[in-house]
Design a protein with these regions (language model features):
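Flexible coil segments in periplasmic/lumen-exposed cytochrome c-class electron-transfer proteins
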Residues: 23-32, 36, 40-41, 49, ...
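N-terminal export/targeting leaders of redox proteins
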Residues: 1-28, 113-119
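Short, cysteine/histidine-rich loop/knuckle motifs that typically chelate Zn2+
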Residues: 45
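Hydrophobic alpha-helical segments
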Residues: 16, 53, 62, 76, ...
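Gly/Gly-Pro-rich "capping" loops immediately C-terminal to redox-active cysteine motifs
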Residues: 31-37, 48-84, 88
Length: 119
């Protein structure tokens, strides 16, 4: 009985460790390089220069982008008219850089808080 109990315990620890590693979050990217790629590869044409959306057909990407896995899935296999950015076109490292850039974009100020609107 102790053998099974010990084996079960070890198996549970290994599974939990693997699950925790899988949920570590997005890969680390270079936000400055991500901004360069975002602007150079045409993302801004539809999604706006700071990911705000509202230009053309692209939805907002920042602040608060999708979780990385969902974001990567949309970029690689878009469910809409966006062209797919396969790993041949955009490497995994470049995709992580773009995501890091989107995470680094601060929220836009609330337009209702602008003093000029009070006049």
């Amino acid at each position: 009985m102790h053998k099974y109990s010990y084996a079960t315990h070890v198996t549970a620890v290994v599974i939990c460790a693997a699950m925790a590693q899988a949920q570590d979050g997005p890969p680390t990217g270079d936000a400055a390089n991500g901004e360069r790629i975002y602007l150079a590869d045409g993302c801004a044409l539809c999604h706006g220069t700071v990911g705000q959306g509202g230009r053309g057909t692209g939805p907002h990407l920042a602040p608060n982008p999708l979780p990385f896995e969902a974001f990567a899935g949309h970029v690689r296999r878009p469910p809409n008219a966006m062209p797919p950015y396969t790993a041949v076109v955009l490497s995994d490292a470049e995709l992580a850089d773009i995501y890091a850039y989107l995470l680094a974009i601060p929220p836009l100020p609330d337009p209702k808080a602008a003093a000029i609107l009070d006049n």
